[in-house]
Amino acid sequence: MATSLGSNTYNRQNWEDADFPILCQTCLGENPYIRMTKEKYGKECKICARPFTVFRWCPGVRMRFKKTEVCQTCSKLKNVCQTCLLDLEYGLPIQVRDAGASLKDEMPRSDVNKEYYTQNMEREIANSDGTRPVGALGKATSSSDMLLKLARTTPYYKRNRPHICSFWVKGECKRGEECPYRHEKPTDPDDPLADQNIKDRYYGINDPVADKLLKRASTMPRLDPPEDKSITTLYVGGLGDTISESELRNHFYQFGEIRTITVVQRQQCAFIQFATRQAAEMAAEKSFNKLIVNGRRLNVKWGRSQAARGKERERDGSSDPGMKLEPVPGLPGALPPPPTEEESSANYFNLPPNGSAALVNISLPPPPGLSGPPPGYGPHMFPPMAPPPFLRAPGHIHYPSQDPQRMGAHAGKPSSG
């Protein structure tokens, strides 16, 4: 059997020989100094079944060794990593990327058609500059909002952890801490994420990870335009102290003519009124959950008309500005007004200005040595004491310190005999 590359018996002219793999940051690892082994024609691609150069490396400490799974041609056709088959730009599965970009997979599945298609794509890749994807992905216009919201911008290195030790699950692992595999409980076998196929991920069908992300995208909040067509005002919140009116105008002028921009610095918000409803809808669609000015993410909502605010107040029962609330139990009553300057010099107890002097009867126990009163008589009573001339009859006592009966102790004179 001929084994030279020039033999067309097994189409060896199309075998791949590469110098460096196409990897994402997560699969490459956080260590910038890694050793990578290279094996020419070490395995066949799991998509096109052609031999290709296999690279193998360890992405970090206590991580499992990883290797390339598909050839670089299949990787460039889908713009994916050779190991995890996730999109290199967004870090998402191919099914999610194609759904967000409205792409349809037109790759053939049969062996002969797949080989012919791959050769044509290789010719197209060779004629391009190599910086942009080819095929249907290269013809895509722009990224959608869903892809920007679901995009994974930071590497997730936990994906490189070792697999679970099957001996530990059975209780037979004797390596202990030296075991290179994880000693953890495995996931539920009924979990859809436990069954993943590399071909299904590449072709974008029956991918459980993609289904999970698409369900999350369907529950994301959306900014629907109000039914009232007269509303052309947008609310922009979270301005802070650094964003000015000119910076808002520089961003929103691209959507249409701006009538007014009102910045409420105290509330750190602004109201932008457009001349047409179409311009306001376009600004709301392009800016909702995506507006960043001076490194600050701003909140964009639709403004509300005065009629709508009045209806909401009537619905909530708060239309009357003088709404009366129920008094809180346990609070003291209203305090009297403060005294005038003339009265405050002598009236220390907030007594009323007019009225007769009150007589204060003080009942004290008899001094020691005196017997109690006879039966049928009350306790010893002392003559009433008149208050000082500057004190007047006490009115309503508001505080205990205003009670003249509590000002010191009053001792009676002992009776002789």
UniProtKB/Swiss-Prot annotation:
GO biological process: mRNA cis splicing, via spliceosome; positive regulation of RNA splicing
Segments forming C3H1-type zinc fingers: 159-186
Residue ranges, compositional bias (Basic and acidic residues): 309-318
SUPFAM superfamilies associated with the record: CCCH zinc finger (SSF90229), RNA-binding domain, RBD (SSF54928)
CDD domains: RRM_RBM22
Chief location bin: nucleus
InterPro entries attached to this UniProt entry: Cwc2/Slt11, Nucleotide-bd_a/b_plait_sf, RBD_domain_sf, RRM_dom, STL11/RBM22-like_N, Znf_CCCH, Znf_CCCH_sf
Classification via SMART domains: RRM, ZnF_C3H1
Superkingdom, natural source: Eukaryota
Bilayer-spanning residue ranges: none
Self-association state and partner proteins as the record states: Component of the pre-catalytic and catalytic spliceosome complexes. Component of the postcatalytic spliceosome P complex.
Protein name: Pre-mRNA-splicing factor RBM22
UniProt organism field: Xenopus tropicalis
Upper classification of the organism: Eukaryota, Metazoa, Chordata, Craniata, Vertebrata
